Amino acid sequence: NDLTSRRYGQYTMNQESTTIKVMEKPPFDRSISQDSLDELSMEDYWIELENIKKSSENSQEDQEVVVVKEPDEGELEEEWLKEAGLSNLFGESAGDPQESIVFLSTLTRTQAAAVQKRVETVSQTLRKKNKQYQIPDVRDIFAQQRESKETAPGGTESQSLRTNENKYQGRDDEASNLVGEEKLIPPEETPAPETDINLEVSFAEQALNQKESSKEKIQKSKGDDATLPSFRLPKDKTGTTRIGDLAPQDMKKVCHLALIELTALYDVLGIELKQQKAVKIKTKDSGLFCVPLTALLEQDQRKVPGMRIPLIFQKLISRIEERGLETEGLLRIPGAAIRIKNLCQELEAKFYEGTFNWESVKQHDAASLLKLFIRELPQPLLSVEYLKAFQAVQNLPTKKQQLQALNLLVILLPDANRDTLKALLEFLQRVIDNKEKNKMTVMNVAMVMAPNLFMCHALGLKSSEQREFVMAAGTANTMHLLIKYQKLLWTIPKFIVNQVRKQNTENHKKDKRAMKKLLKKMAYDREKYEKQDKSTNDADVPQGVIRVQAPHLSKVSMAIQLTEELKASDVLARFLSQESGVAQTLKKGEVFLYEIGGNIGERCLDDDTYMKDLYQLNPNAEWVIKSKPL
């Protein structure tokens, strides 16, 4: 198969033989990933696979295998539309398409094309099955959207997109096509140029504009991954939004848009994006290993309310760190298989009782237990739904696009998976920070961890499928990107936040129209309502001044004059400087300034948010200082 033919090597894992067979390099058609790795650097990968094979032979119990359902015709697209929040366009739940018009009207042309493509497939499938469901033609809905855009002032959408993108173009491509040297060189010895990542324009639109403006085929990224471009986020005056900063109702909209955007990006670049679905199976609902993350967290939260990362996972990491991260071969050298099996059984029996003797756990054993925990999750840490999409990242032409896809995939992960992945990546970075002593470079760590993340024990794949599933160098490179760019991956792109703001504004208008109709029916004084509505926001605050509420601080409210340079950190500093008594112990980082209401549900502001710029973007917001919810 195509993927197999482009690999440096493959391994077999038959019952008869446990030897790893590394095939010769194919002379042609090497993928991006293979160009960036030499054969020596693959050794850690194959050794790790052999260690996994041995440890699975000593596994303490047979785990029930997750069945990954092969979807019927049209079923994949139907599921996709549900995940994208558009299930009311078809089927038994089909209702007034007006409900989706607000959502669809905020989409870019590439996002709209992705939705249209899936609706047409579902529509054809349902017609074949002779189902009498009313399926609105999405082209009609988008026609309304186009009409409203044509009448809007300020030029067309694609014009503004291109204008906005021009300032970033060239720099991205230059950095994406860096050619590295033969051997692995630590990044700090070869400083790669810093390149701004454009978060203001849809990623799929950027890819399409690049395709349209370039007559030649986009050159694929090459180069040793040690010289990956150093991408950075340009400062956004309205503040950078990170995962965890938004209220749940807005985060739900972000996830819908992230799925549509990811699909649009893969469509534009001609990469197949297949979501998978796990059939529900009976899993353990207590214990430590082979337990779903959500079940683990439920039992942990009974002990420690608000816990977001499994206690056993945290304890294994802290045990490794207690012995110092300078140990040579950390993560690479396995613990003895029999000892690991015994430790697993002992942990299951004693961990929650608090009687387990952690002093008896050697550092390499703790590292092996950590990797075992990840592998034995009933569903992969990267989720059944998106595991293949994470793998397909290696097929995107440029490093910039690979980073953009990973950003959207991280947003799409369930909360428990995303939080645990973040804790893992932060730990791996700390290991790499000690590479001079432990001899574990970012590439070594990526090689060792890739099979543990991408080869989920519970998926129970046959050896032939498994060879295709693991895709050696490709998954190692995806792992490397996750580690290197982790600080960027937990950012919500500005264009998506702006789409959420637009949706909220349109929904408010719709609600207001409904309210006016209702008031008219009730023979209410409509004028009085409109007058009230108009004056609520300018109540007692003069122009150019915001009123900041701080219900839990001694100074509960303050009017603050907006200036060009006023930042969120300045507002916080003014409040905290006036604290006395108990509240004086409040430190920076314990309370945050929030933007609440207007065109957003709730958003925690980063310190560098320029308040005047944000006020202009959301003049109807309230400004509140409070701590982050657990």
Role assignments for model-derived ranges:
Residues N1-W358, M447, P451-S535, V541, ...:
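Intrinsically disordered regulatory linkers and targeting segments
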Residues Y386-L387, K399-T475:
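Alpha-helical bundle/repeat cores within regulatory domains of eukaryotic proteins
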Residues R319-A367, L372-L413, H457:
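Alpha-helical cores of eukaryotic small-GTPase signaling modules
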Residues P310-I312, H364-L372, H480-L481, M558-I560:
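Conserved, well-structured core segments
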Residues Q299-K303, M307, L381, Q404-V410, ...:
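An all-alpha helical bundle fold corresponding to the catalytic cores
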Residues G270-G287, R513-L630:
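Intrinsically disordered, Pro/Ser/Thr-rich cytosolic linker and juxtamembrane tail regions that serve as
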Residues A258, P292, I312, R332, ...:
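Beta-strand cores of modular interaction/reader domains in eukaryotic scaffold and signaling proteins
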